[in-house]
Amino acid sequence: MTRRSRRVAYVAKACVSCARSKQRCDGHSPCGRCSLKNLDCVYRHLLQKGQNSTRGASPQSPSASRESYSQNTLPVVQSQTRPLALDSAPSVYSPASEAIGEPPSLSTDVGNNFVEMSMDSGQETFPDGVSVNNLTFKIGESDLQGWASLGVDIPWNSSMHSMLDNPLFELPDPMAFFFQSPSELLGQSDVQAIPCPMDSEPMVHQLECETPTPNFTHSLDISSYQGQSNQTSPETTSHSSVRDDAELESWRAEDYGHVPDINDEAYQVMVFTFEQLNSDNVYCIPFTDKHLPSLQHMQIYMQVYFEEYHPIFPLLHKATFSPNKDDWLLSLAVSSIGCLFSKTLRSKEVFPIMQEFLRRAIRIQTSTPSISVAQASVLNQIGMMYGGDLRFAECAHETMAQLTTQCRKIASSSHNLANSSIAENTVSQGWQAWVRAQLEIRLFYCAWLVDSQQVGFFAFSSTIPIDFLQFPMPINEYVWGMSTAETWQNSLAEDSSSQQLTSLRQVLMGLYRYREVPGQLDAFNSLLLVMGILNDLSGLRHAHLYLEILQRRVETLPPTALTRAVMTNIHMVSLLIYFPTREVIAFGRWRVTEAQHSIVTEKLKRWMSDTRSARAALVHACSIWSQVRLSRTNSHHEPPALLYSAISIWALVEHSEEVVENADELPILRLDSLNQDVKLWAAGNEKKRLYLSGVGLLAHRGALARLISETARLLEQRIAWPQAWRTGPHLKQSYAESRRVQ
């Protein structure tokens, strides 16, 4: 029986509500969907026989508490035939399923960009396959190695060729290097006029003359949504508290007291939603056989987040952060990141479970988007992209559009953005109103920052254009860190550096035209400028000069973890100017043919004939490698930065054409730090013996083997992000393959 004939027969037996919505119906009276959504369940053939419509709850349905959450906990899934069933073993990663058959036509509206992917519709369902949204996925033994299934709400039906297309020689997707087994591709891959400005970029005039880009604050037609229920479930799951003495001591050591603890009411909402989304019903399938971590553990993870991760990613306002029932989703997101850095037993094992729970919980939100939900989406985006599981990474690329939509809706209905500048009228509004406005601004800039890093580090297509950010850049860290309204007001009155910056595009235009940055620029805003330069990289002629200006500015800032992270990003973008992401990965022999590798190698050799460019790239690569090795920051960008720097050093050393006679008589130049001697060597022609701490002399016969071994050790043992754990073995395998071929 064909799929079309089955579908006709199936819909004919559906109730009126399911048939009208084209949803799955189990045929019961009432059906499971109508029971869970508290809808009238009517069958036409029963009415024709004179029977009355049925309304009510299923005998198996819970009481009023479950009904109160039904609108928020049940996702809408269309055109599904049956759930995608994967194993729920405790392993963190597994290969992605391969699409077979011919997928249907897809149209996606991302921000202001309408993308259409035309594909034919498949006609068969294979015996060992599953069908989701008219797409058939083949499930083999290797596909059943994962820690949990991702459920039917994963957007498997969208190919990734928009970010993998390469007109030269179809290099592989760089993101594939960071995961256990990459999936096969489905296809191919207002600046004021100031007299006498300096010689500027051609794109400055182009940007000034372009039609203005619509921004986040343009009004949108926002439909009214039903608010979340205030009821909590009386049903709770018993979770044992921490009993092991060693684990108890770890808990006490990590009780930093940065923010208030999660209250029991908020935790019960988490437990109830977890049970709903981890149940076996017509809307989702279980993804784990584990329990949600105990309340005590969730509190640990939240404190660790503000100790380890908040200083390098200041999305939240620590002084006013309140983990209450209304913002339980944000509390869950914070804990899901904090568990990576906790020293308590088995804390890293719960990371994939919490990320999948968070992903599902965000997806079913139907109320008007709030700041806390969007903030949770940003953290979930980071957790999935750098979580080491290819399926999560594919979801992260798809759900970036959902985050963009959340930001647009929040901005369009906001009354705070127009009053977000630091002025007397803002002070008179009060601290809470100012914090609210700044939280919105930081949300939008952090979402754009995450998107830009994915573009640079994984060659993704951009989802949030930089010109959407037409509001002031975030306030500096000093004012943002104020813990009371009194100290906040004093800082505004006394500190001139607390004045608000203009928009990111305006600051970039000033940098391009006059080669200067505002004097009040702090570390976080410097990072935004670095990513802005990366965004404009293809149209800039002097990108390295602008990065050097930012580097000199960052060197004057206090030596914090965020400052070190900004320096690493500066060197990373500088390296990508010379050695693009795709070519770095292709040189590492990851999923390329010998012909493709030869093309990359020959191109590299021709480029290295320019000694100064080759030396500059080597200096930046060594700076990245040394900074991550000696002063880790726990930032999510460190796994790709360490990997790219190691492969770049490998390539530049192996194919260097600098012939040195009597090398033992030459002075040694250490590339661990970017001092004046290193800069002079990079800009000149003087010969040196190059030394890198942890590797030794780079010209030594075994230097590259030591480089790869040390890099793999750092990735597997020293970096907290799961992506790094997956990358180390790949790097060793690639180097071994290279030695074998040679």
Swiss-Prot record:
Entry keyword Ribosomal protein: no
Disruption outcome: Does not affect the expression of expression of DMATS1, FFUJ_09176,and FFUJ_09178; nor the metabolite production.
Induction / repression: Expression is negaticely regulated by the global nitrogen regulator areA.
DNA-binding region coordinates: 15-41
Cross-referenced SUPFAM superfamilies: Zn2/Cys6 DNA-binding domain (SSF57701)
Gene3D superfamilies: Zn(2)-C6 fungal-type DNA-binding domain (4.10.240.10)
Domain of life of the source: Eukaryota
Listed GO MF terms: DNA binding; DNA-binding transcription factor activity, RNA polymerase II-specific; zinc ion binding
GO cellular component: nucleus
Broad class of where this protein is predominantly found: nucleus
Cell compartments where the protein resides: Nucleus
Keywords: DNA-binding, Metal-binding, Nucleus, Transcription, Transcription regulation, Zinc
PROSITE patterns: ZN2_CY6_FUNGAL_1, ZN2_CY6_FUNGAL_2
Record function comment: Transcription factor; part of the DMATS1 gene cluster that mediates the biosynthesis of a reversely N-prenylated monomeric L-tryptophan (r-N-DMAT). Seems not to regulate the expression of the DMATS1 cluster.
PANTHER family, A to Z: TRANSCRIPTION FACTOR WITH C2H2 AND ZN(2)-CYS(6) DNA BINDING DOMAIN (EUROFUNG)-RELATED-RELATED (PTHR47660)
Protein name (Swiss-Prot/TrEMBL): Transcription factor FFUJ_09177
Annotated organism of origin: Gibberella fujikuroi (strain CBS 195.34 / IMI 58289 / NRRL A-6831)
Taxonomic path: Eukaryota, Fungi, Dikarya, Ascomycota, Pezizomycotina
